[in-house]
Amino acid sequence: MKMIVGLGNPGSKYAKTKHNIGFMVIDQLCEKYNVTLNKHDFEAEYGSFKYEGETVLLVKPLTFMNDSGRSVGPLMSYYQVGIDELLVIQDDMDLTMGKLRLRQKGSAGGHNGIKSIIAHTKSQTFKRLKIGIQHPQKSTVVNWVLTPFDKDGAPVINQAIDQACEESTTGVKMTTL
């Protein structure tokens, strides 16, 4: 079993914000593979589908971003998902808008959602698909990540979401995700 977790904040207030790029990718994967996130426990909403014979869990933690591990850790334990079978989709301010980067392991890099997952899984060796949201020019980090993409950024991000969906499912084909 593989688990793809999209990071974000719950609620309509945050739905289209930069910090919710992980949720946006999960939503598109759900649409593409006809998945309903109909399970609601472990402080998450999630659903599953089969991809080339492999069960894949799509997960949106319902904790706020900075406490995502509180949901991810118990879900992994319950479904016996190994750390090498986890892919986390996150925003990254250090990447230019729409750029994708797959990391096999590493520190949180200042991302509190990743820091929480590391704390709850006791490992840094899970894969992350980072999507660039660019560093704010003038606004504070909090204001930047909690605002929607502007008219110039939206088409770039929509393309990045499409690409992230492809990268996510390509990873599922690999033995170690």
Curated annotation (Swiss-Prot):
Keywords: Cytoplasm, Hydrolase, RNA-binding, tRNA-binding
GO MF terms, alphabetically ordered: peptidyl-tRNA hydrolase activity; tRNA binding
Name this protein carries in UniProt: Peptidyl-tRNA hydrolase
Leading EC class: hydrolase
Main location, first listed in the record: cytoplasm
Record keyword Cytoplasm present: yes
Location within or outside the cell: Cytoplasm
Record-level GO cellular component terms: cytoplasm
Record-marked site positions (Discriminates between blocked and unblocked aminoacyl-tRNA): N9
Entry annotation: catalytic residues: H19
GO BP, sorted A to Z: protein quality control for misfolded or incompletely synthesized proteins; rescue of stalled ribosome
Catalytic reaction annotation: an N-acyl-L-alpha-aminoacyl-tRNA + H2O = an N-acyl-L-amino acid + a tRNA + H(+)
Annotated CDD domains: PTH
Upper classification of the organism: Bacteria, Bacillati, Bacillota, Bacilli, Lactobacillales
PANTHER family noted in UniProt: PEPTIDYL-TRNA HYDROLASE (PTHR17224:SF1)
Pfam family, one: Pept_tRNA_hydro
